[in-house]
Design a protein with these regions (language model features):
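Active-site glycine-centered loops adjacent to acidic/histidine catalytic or metal-binding residues
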Residues: 175, 203-204, 241-242, 288, ...
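Short beta-strand micro-motifs enriched in acidic
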Residues: 388, 454-460, 596, 624-626
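Extended active-site neighborhood of metal-dependent phosphoesterases/phosphodiesterases
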Residues: 119, 126-159, 212-325, 329, ...
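Lectin-like carbohydrate-binding module/patch detector with strong preference for beta-trefoil
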Residues: 500-682
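Short coil/turn segments at secondary-structure boundaries
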Residues: 183-187, 212-214, 250-252, 299, ...
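Acidic, histidine-bearing metal-coordination/catalytic regions of metal-dependent phosphoesterases
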Residues: 1-198, 223-238, 444-447, 452-503, ...
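Short, Asp-centered acidic motifs that coordinate Mg2+ and/or phosphate
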Residues: 170, 197-198, 328-330, 374
Length: 682
């Protein structure tokens, strides 16, 4: 059973060891003139031995004389992989003495080393020493790029661009970079059946995204798929997963820089995050890089680790794209926002009581849920449609199963976190689940899946789009006759509906600025703006005109729930430029609230855009940049026409959590990947 040898673990150095051994075996087989596929590699005894070594080590029981029968040649090979790997780690850490001890033990069995694990040691150590643990990552701000244009895919990129037609079909695949035969067959099916205008991958090229794997398990297979389908190539965009960074990201960046030119398209993706918009400006895809902060071996031992999270400057980049786009957004990530099956936050993390949700991603994008039609992610090797509007997100969809062979025995549909509810098909009353397929050995796998988003047929730019999910046979070692995709489900992605819920007085609410920041904590009674730590406000009527709910033109007070200010909890505009909290019951702490658009009536609902005008100064409330300080405070200004949205706290368990960790015992280093570095090799 060769696919039993396709072991993947959440460990950077073990995954990279698998990559190095796989490359060594491939090189040896190619010397014989054989046509080498990943399926063929998996049948090699050295790959089988390494898989067993990696599996045991990941479980905390590394192979050794106490756990193996070292008179058995196959188990000797498992032990050799272990010894060579440990020696390589010692060399990377400059621990010559321990490396020598592993080498002495290795020599006892070196006559059984049929592929040369010793050379794998050299390759492993040289790669890590070459990059000195420094990751590849292109930070737009560090590069001095323009935030408004960097990473935005368009046809005016120095003559090498791509424009997404308004009637486009976009195919989405996840965790596809296995290099297996059914991965290529699935892509051929997409190209032949749907003729997409572009293809987007949600990350993970196995085992560790080395330059060699990024070619053999990704770009070369994409090129072959277009050749087999006899179709002109279309652009392919990909965001990184954790496996893409297990070799520090240099393989991923070297591939993505040249991917589209090599397959024959004019598109170019300069970073691990991107923005792709329809020509009519109605819809945009935002791809994010969650892999970078789930890539370090220290992650597994970090007691503060939960997440992952985005880099601070990337958060600012996404906010810019959401703040300055009037249409609907589809978010794309490798990692999950939430899960009903997998634990996201470790048992010793700060968020162990919240194991099924990513607190950092939630706080990053919560202010924009009214603009986000859907969020599609991978990482878990399954297809799941979660309940609509769960935790305030219109649609969350898991699509991490486009090539990964998921055994039914792994039970990916087990509901370990019942608070994360799955979507129920109203016609059948059941969850939407993948079918299964057994190979000739009786081993059963869940099928693969992909999505096609169809933008055609819209009258207005922001009209809904049709998304169809398909499943494709997963066949292990034995392909079925004439495999073909079948439809799983079809649904509409649309902008979230305008809230029908009126805003009541004396209820906790958040005030979200037109620039995407909340009114946050206070400093010496002065509230400041925050991306990720909103502080709830309450409205108290000065003159009630329409009962218990806010209405256009009401006069009210804005009260903070921040206990640090005590009884001085009324937001006021006094003689100082900055607004602050006090307890004066006069017009300086009174505000008029006006709806920006009254075409749907005078009642104020959650999500409505409103102005706050101070009753004493007759000036609009807005943030301002206080010179010399790193945060925005509040002030008033005449005729500012600055608007706010009143939002309902969606998840009280996440209040006070920031979009990035407050502290961590280690810091990663990264360098930008430049075009001249594209020919990086292991």
């Amino acid at each position: 059973m060769s696919l039993q040898n396709f072991v993947r673990v959440h460990n950077a150095t073990l995954s990279f060891w698998q990559s190095v051994v796989s490359q060594r075996v491939r090189q040896q087989l190619e010397l014989t003139g054989a046509k080498v596929s990943h399926n063929l590699l998996l049948k090699h005894p050295a790959i089988a031995a390494t898989a067993q070594h990696v599996k045991l080590t990941a479980k905390g029981t590394p192979p050794g004389p106490d756990t193996l029968d070292l008179t058995d040649p196959d188990q000797q090979m498992v032990y050799l992989s272990h010894l060579a790997y440990e020696k390589a780690l010692c060399l990377v850490e400059s621990d010559v003495q321990r490396a020598g001890a592993f080498d002495t033990e290795y020599r006892k069995y070196s006559d059984k080393d049929i592929i040369g694990f010793a050379s794998c040691v050299t390759t492993f150590a040289e790669y890590y020493l070459k990059y000195a643990g420094v990751f590849a990552y292109n930070d737009w701000k560090e590069l001095g790029e323009d935030i408004s244009t960097y990473g935005v895919i368009n046809e005016n990129d120095n003559g090498n661009g791509f424009s997404l037609p308004s009637d486009a079909r976009v195919a989405i695949i996840g965790d596809w970079g296995t290099g297996l035969a059914d991965a290529q067959a699935l892509l051929v099916d997409i190209i032949e059946r749907h003729n997409p205008h572009c293809i987007i991958h949600l990350g993970d090229i196995y085992y560790s995204g080395t330059p060699e794997e990024c070619v053999n398990n990704f770009s070369a297979i994409i090129k072959n798929a277009f050749d087999i389908a006899e179709k002109d190539p279309v652009p392919v965009f990909t965001i990184p997963g954790n496996h893409d960074y297990y070799s520090l990201g240099w393989g991923y960046y070297s591939m993505v820089y040249g991917l589209n030119s090599e397959i024959g398209t004019a598109a170019f993706q300069p970073a691990s995050y991107f923005c792709l918009r329809t020509e009519d400006g109605g819809w945009q895809f935002l791809g994010m890089d969650t892999g970078y902060n789930d890539s370090d071996p220290a992650d597994q031992a970090d007691p503060f680790y939960a997440g992952p999270w985005l880099q601070p400057n990337e958060i600012e980049w996404h906010q810019d794209k959401l703040n300055n786009f009037a249409g609907a957004t589809i978010l794309l990530s490798h990692h999950q926002l939430f899960s009903s099956n997998a634990k996201i936050n470790g048992a010793w993390s700060d968020f162990s009581a919240l194991p099924s949700q990513n607190p950092y991603l939630y706080q990053t994008f919560l202010p924009y849920f009214s603009k986000i039609a859907a969020w599609i992610w991978g990482h878990e090797h399954n297809f799941v449609m979660f309940e609509n509007d769960l935790l305030g997100l219109s649609k969350g969809r898991l699509l991490g199963c486009s090539a990964f062979e998921e055994l039914t025995s792994s039970d990916p549909y087990a509901i370990n976190y019942p608070d994360i509810k799955n979507f129920i098909d109203p016609e059948t009353g059941n969850m939407i689940q993948l079918s299964t397929n057994a190979d000739l050995n009786g081993v059963t796998y869940y099928n693969h899946a992909y999505a096609v988003i169809d933008f055609s047929g819209r009258t207005n730019p922001t009209d809904p789009v049709t998304t169809t999910y398909y499943e494709y046979p997963s066949w292990g070692d034995n392909p079925p006759d004439n495999p073909e995709a079948t439809q799983l489900y079809q649904e509409q992605y649309s902008l979230p509906a305008v809230s029908e819920v009126q805003v009541p007085y004396l209820a906790n609410t958040y005030l979200l600025s037109q620039d995407g920041q909340f009114i946050g904590p206070e400093y010496k009674d002065y509230p400041y703006m925050s991306n990720d730590t909103p502080v709830a406000q309450q409205f108290y009527p000065v003159v009630v005109t329409s009962g218990n709910y806010l209405t256009h033109g009401d006069k009210l007070r804005i009260l903070t729930t921040d206990s640090s200010v005590g009884d001085k909890n009324q937001l006021g505009a006094f003689t100082r430029k900055s607004l602050y909290y006090d307890d004066d019951n006069n017009d300086k702490t009174a505000w008029y609230v006006y709806k920006r658009d009254t075409s749907n009536g005078m009642d104020i609902h959650y999500g409505d855009e409103v102005y706050f005008v101070n009753a004493d100064w007759n000036q609009w409330m807005l943030p301002y940049d206080s010179v010399g300080l790193s945060v925005l405070y509040l002030t008033t200004e005449e005729n500012a026409n600055y608007y706010w949205s009143i939002t309902l706290p969606q998840n009280s368990a996440l209040e006070g959590i920031t979009a990035i960790p407050k502290k961590s015992p280690y810091r990663k280093k990264h360098l930008p990947f430049m075009k001249q570095e594209k020919n990086v090799i292991v």
